[in-house]
């Protein structure tokens, strides 16, 4: 009887460890829906096919990006931006998705290969269970050796419906949001300034095989028995300083054509310069309840912690 009881306890603990985070019930904070303040664009108007063109289907404001054995797929914005509001509604592949990476990010690596900036929301398929996790990261001036990752569990199932993934990048701060809830803020002040992205960037939406990178050196590679892995993309919002159109020189305040005070882009205006009290409370909720990794707490990784961690 004792052996059976101990076996049952072990089984129970193991079962608990496999429970997806989105199976838990969360009461989410009420926040302003920033995504309601910007217009949506047609995919073809805002993006070009970056890679895997045969795995990209576009129908108006909806796109489907597919990862299979032949290739992943990626879109890149037709314009480069120096600050802006960037958002898309994504629906992730259901089922076993170990090694699958869906990325919504800003980068200028193609323009500045040795000193590039990057702001990432990366959605990582998990091994041994069907839930996904959120990873955020920031690079500036080619500082790729200093990973500034922070990782979060979802509070919903991202495979069952569309959800908003948003980046706010301006001269004040960078904010990462999921369903309009801020999960991370990276300010442009103090010790953070040396690591703050400052050059014009393009927006990318991609799905790719990240087995070697995302699953402990390939321990849990993509299993193409479950392919194709399809990511649905909708309601894309691109609002900011388009460098290509000459509305920004890459320095100074973010302005629309005209250059007057009244032409300040709202993304660099007062409403977006700081987080509201409700947004700060919501971010605190997300970080307390759902964040499970921060580079600033990883002392084994860094003998000398990045300056902003101090």
UniProtKB/Swiss-Prot annotation:
Residues in GH16 domain copies: 22-233
Q: Where in the cell is it found?
A: Secreted, Cell wall; Secreted, Extracellular space, Apoplast; Cell membrane
> Where are the membrane-spanning stretches?
90-106
> What turns on this gene?
Regulated by ATX1 and ATX2 by epigenetic histone H3 methylation.
Q: What class of enzyme is it?
A: transferase
The catalytic site is made up of 118 (nucleophile), 122 (proton donor)
Write the record's keywords in alphabetical order, separated by commas: Apoplast, Cell membrane, Cell wall, Cell wall biogenesis/degradation, Disulfide bond, Glycoprotein, Glycosidase, Hydrolase, Membrane, Secreted, Signal, Transferase, Transmembrane, Transmembrane helix
What InterPro entries does its record include?
Answer: Beta-glucanase/XTH (IPR044791), ConA-like_dom_sf (IPR013320), GH16 (IPR000757), XET_C (IPR010713), XTH (IPR016455)
Tissue expression per record? Expressed at low levels in vegetative tissues (roots, stems and seedlings). Predominantly expressed in green siliques. Expressed in flowers.
One GO BP on record is: cell wall biogenesis
Query: What are the disulfide bonds?
Result: 296-309
Q: What EC identifiers does the entry list?
A: 2.4.1.207
Please give the family membership noted in the entry. Belongs to the glycosyl hydrolase 16 family. XTH group 3 subfamily.
Q: Which PANTHER family match?
A: XYLOGLUCAN ENDOTRANSGLUCOSYLASE/HYDROLASE PROTEIN 8-RELATED (PTHR31062)
Identification of the protein by name: Probable xyloglucan endotransglucosylase/hydrolase protein 33
């Amino acid at each position: 009887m004792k052996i059976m009881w101990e076996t049952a306890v072990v089984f129970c603990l193991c079962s608990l460890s496999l429970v997806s985070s989105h199976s838990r019930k969360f009461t989410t904070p009420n926040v302003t829906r920033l995504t309601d303040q910007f217009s949506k664009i047609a995919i073809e108007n805002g993006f070009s096919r970056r890679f895997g063109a045969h795995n990209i289907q576009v129908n108006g404001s909806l796109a489907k990006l597919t990862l299979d054995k032949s290739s992943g797929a990626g879109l890149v914005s037709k314009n480069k931006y120096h600050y802006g509001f960037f958002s898309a509604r994504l629906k992730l592949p259901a089922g076993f998705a170990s090694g699958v990476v869906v990325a919504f990010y800003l980068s200028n690596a193609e323009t500045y290969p040795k000193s590039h900036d990057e702001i990432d929301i990366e959605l990582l398929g998990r091994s041994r269970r069907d839930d996904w996790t959120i990873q955020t990261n920031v690079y500036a001036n080619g500082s790729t050796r200093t990973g500034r990752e922070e990782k979060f569990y979802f509070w919903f199932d991202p495979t069952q419906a569309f959800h908003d993934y948003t980046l706010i990048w301006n001269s004040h701060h960078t904010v990462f949001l999921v369903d309009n809830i801020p999960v991370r803020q990276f300010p442009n002040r103090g010790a953070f300034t040396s690591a703050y992205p400052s050059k014009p960037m393009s927006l990318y939406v991609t799905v790719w095989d990240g087995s070697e990178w995302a699953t402990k050196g390939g321990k849990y590679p993509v299993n193409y028995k479950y392919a194709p892995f399809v990511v649905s993309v909708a309601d894309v919002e691109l609002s900011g300083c388009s460098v290509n159109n000459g509305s920004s020189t890459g320095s100074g305040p973010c302005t629309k054509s005209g250059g007057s005070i009244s032409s300040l882009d709202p993304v660099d205006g007062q409403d977006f310069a700081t987080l509201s009290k409700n947004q700060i409370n919501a971010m605190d909720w997300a970080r307390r309840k759902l964040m499970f990794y921060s580079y600033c707490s990883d002392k084994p990784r860094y003998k000398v912690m990045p300056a902003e961690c101090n």
